[in-house]
Amino acid sequence: MARAAPLLAALTALLAAAAAGGDAPPGKIAVVGAGIGGSAVAHFLQQHFGPRVQIDVYEKGTVGGRLATISVNKQHYESGAASFHSLSLHMQDFVKLLGLRHRREVVGRSAIFGGEHFMLEETDWYLLNLFRLWWHYGISFLRLQMWVEEVMEKFMRIYKYQAHGYAFSGVEELLYSLGESTFVNMTQHSVAESLLQVGVTQRFIDDVVSAVLRASYGQSAAMPAFAGAMSLAGAQGSLWSVEGGNKLVCSGLLKLTKANVIHATVTSVTLHSTEGKALYQVAYENEVGNSSDFYDIVVIATPLHLDNSSSNLTFAGFHPPIDDVQGSFQPTVVSLVHGYLNSSYFGFPDPKLFPFANILTTDFPSFFCTLDNICPVNISASFRRKQPQEAAVWRVQSPKPLFRTQLKTLFRSYYSVQTAEWQAHPLYGSRPTLPRFALHDQLFYLNALEWAASSVEVMAVAAKNVALLAYNRWYQDLDKIDQKDLMHKVKTEL
């Protein structure tokens, strides 16, 4: 009888799929991954299909994915994505919807370190900062700002398109709708090449642009221009975080959606069909054992293209077969160090005189990318940032785990070191083509968009796109998919 149970479940699912027709909504939807992408797409899917649809969210680790915290000395600190741009409209909406609050900002000065001395130092005076940029680099910073603003102005069109229900089956189609061939070409040309064409100097690229890209992606100005522009936009705008931790957005959305969170590793997705209608069998394993279930719609909201085989998800029964092995990811190690900064390494023998809370680096030194004096996720009204001579919690971002000798280079002494290792972003340039959101009729790959650019808001944009794509495909509203000249269409719909 136990052996018959899976067969009965399969038969029931197939009969339900055969009976479904016309305007009937899907019965069950599976989402693989409970990071910001998976949490957001569960919310958007329920928003479009209605509350009666059962949504199962599979997560092998902790809800939140790359939004995570680490406890240091009885306080929690961000160990994953630390902040969001002010123009992150979906994230702003989530925070309002969930009744969360922006974390109180604690101001700190930044600088770019070149291994022997600081290349650029921020002051407390805005006009003096502008003068220093002009004195060292001419009008390169203005040309950079104009270039980034032009890209962002076009990218912001996606919110209007999504508000009108339009979706895209591939990353290239989405980019073309926003910036035509310019955006598509920006995924094939480097940041450095694109900035040189608009008059930004090589020195400014080496000293400033490279430091920002290392801080965001751990990569150089040889990375594609589109991803670079999105990163540089984050460096120019005002940033914010969620009080209590950014991961609260993920858990809050899943709770709001009443999604069924299944703590398990999805091992395969197998295609079945009845009367021409696709049905997907999702197999998974957890501490109890192996099992599977059937779904009308499946969304993969976790990276498939990891070259270290950490993603063991396979696809069966698809013709042609689904390619899931191209591309590599950039490893990033975040170390939270509770200790005393070695200010002498940065040219300040007296730690009381060290003025910076955030340090970016150029290509040298190579063993770390950024060093930040960070604040806990809960900031009281009386909170103050630690003085440079005091023991503080520092966040060190590096391409590899830090050796003890490297820690001793950065810190005079320390009480504790806790690390989080991430496959943080795609290694841009390691994949020859842009992937597609639609892998099959109702099988979608949300993380496809991070091969164009990678950020929390980009994942939220991808989540909305996939939810709309699934909805439009389910109800055969093909006029809402991969449409050209959307700016004109949207204007005529107003």
Swiss-Prot record:
Keywords: FAD, Flavoprotein, Glycoprotein, Oxidoreductase, Secreted, Signal. One of its GO terms (molecular function) is prenylcysteine oxidase activity. It is found in: Secreted. Its cofactor is FAD. InterPro entries: FAD/NAD-bd_sf, Prenylcys_lyase, Prenylcysteine_Oxase1. Residues 1-22 form the signal peptide. Glycans are attached at residue 342. It comes from the Eukaryota. GO terms for biological process: neutrophil-mediated killing of bacterium; prenylated protein catabolic process; prenylcysteine catabolic process. One of its GO terms (cellular component) is membrane. Pfam families: NAD_binding_8, Prenylcys_lyase. Its EC number is 1.8.3.-. Likely to have oxidoreductase activity. Required in the mevalonate pathway to regulate prenylation and enhances the bactericidal activity of neutrophils. Belongs to the prenylcysteine oxidase family. This is Prenylcysteine oxidase 1-like. The lineage of its organism: Eukaryota, Metazoa, Chordata, Craniata, Vertebrata.
